[in-house]
Amino acid sequence: MNRGRGGFRGGRGGRTGPSQFQQGPPDTVLEMGAFMQSCEGDIVCRSINVKIPYFNAPIYLENKTQVGKVDEILGPVNEVFFTIKPSEGVQADSFKDGDKFYIGPDKLLPLERFLPKPKEFGTKPKKKSAGGAGRGGFGGRGGARGGRGGFGGRGGSRGGFGDRGGRGGSRGGFGGRGGSRGGFGDRGGFGGRGGSRGGFGDRGGRGGGFRGGRF
């Protein structure tokens, strides 16, 4: 399984932010998400923060008790959802609708990081090629099916939040992990994890997950 470190081509996991070593809870925590439901032992949340969390970022209660880590990021960029892999001893179904979860401020990325850059208009001066240089190379056009500014797909078989969301999520959205976990979305909703996690949505299937990779 290709777990690249640069550019959203992984699944879950990846770097957790500036520091790789956790030394207890941070001095301050910010609201990150609100509980929606449990799903196969994971906690499904709606983001209430304008920024995007790192994969594997620790998630806390308001009293800074750690309850788990960010597992997946799903949905279009204007309506982000994420799942939490609970810590040992934490039961996903012990929470109720609306319960809030928190994150350290150093584990967040600005949304602009995932948005497409505006096109530049006007003619650009032609660059002179270096002597002996050929016309091509192996450069691509950037990206790898990850959608415009979102997370693409990891494939797999754990299902996906989304209707037609598959193969890399929507333009500017976050995929899931392939498959048919159900789905909250419509055309570019949430990708999935394969399998059949039951359903939040319509056609669920074929959702791609995180083909944009990791942080």
Swiss-Prot record:
Organism of this sequence: Debaryomyces hansenii (strain ATCC 36239 / CBS 767 / BCRC 21394 / JCM 1990 / NBRC 0083 / IGC 2968)
Biased composition (Gly residues): 1-16, 131-215
Start and end residues of each stretch annotated as RGG-box 2: 135-213
Main location: nucleus
A Gene Ontology biological process term: snoRNA guided rRNA pseudouridine synthesis
Region entry Disordered, spans: 1-26, 117-215
UniProt xrefs under SUPFAM superfamilies: Translation proteins
GO molecular function: box H/ACA snoRNA binding
Localization annotation: Nucleus, Nucleolus
Gene Ontology CC terms, in alphabetical order: box H/ACA snoRNP complex
InterPro entries: Gar1/Naf1_Cbf5-bd_sf, H/ACA_rnp_Gar1/Naf1, Transl_B-barrel_sf
Name of the protein in its database record: H/ACA ribonucleoprotein complex subunit GAR1
One Pfam family it belongs to: Gar1
Region of interest called RGG-box 1, as start-end residue ranges on this chain: 5-17
